[in-house]
Amino acid sequence: MRAVLDTNIYVDFASGKLDVVNLLAIQSTEILLPAIVMGELFYGFIKGSRTRYNEEKFHHFVSTLDVYFIHVNEHVARKYAIIFSALTNNGTRIPINDVWIAACCMSVGGTLLTRDRHFEQVSQIDKIILP
């Protein structure tokens, strides 16, 4: 599985939550991280009291597990437009960053790993929503 991580999944992994650690270890052939998730993580690191520690832990995660980054480009922007249009047509609203995360996932044909149930509304992507 090409696992595209949502912010909450990285946080759970970094905290050592076994369901996430096992899922990534057993089922993932590739781990991908959208640029938007990196932005959310760095924001959290800056807001917290252990900025340097959290950044070092993140960089260790990226280098140890050979994580690939999904950058926002024209291809991702087009996927964003498709997803956002479908959500709007259905009268559905989800956080805008999550539309971008879904677009990143769609652009690489990955499976989004998340704990956010509102991704159930995004039919264009494969997803695993953990409890």
Where are these regions (language model features)?
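Generic structural signal for small/hydrophobic residues in well-ordered secondary structure
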Residues: D6-T7, L41, Y80, C105
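Conserved beta-strand segments of alpha/beta enzyme cores
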Residues: E30, D66-Y68, D126
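Short, hinge-like loop/turn segments at secondary-structure boundaries
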Residues: G48-R52, L87-T88, I129-P131
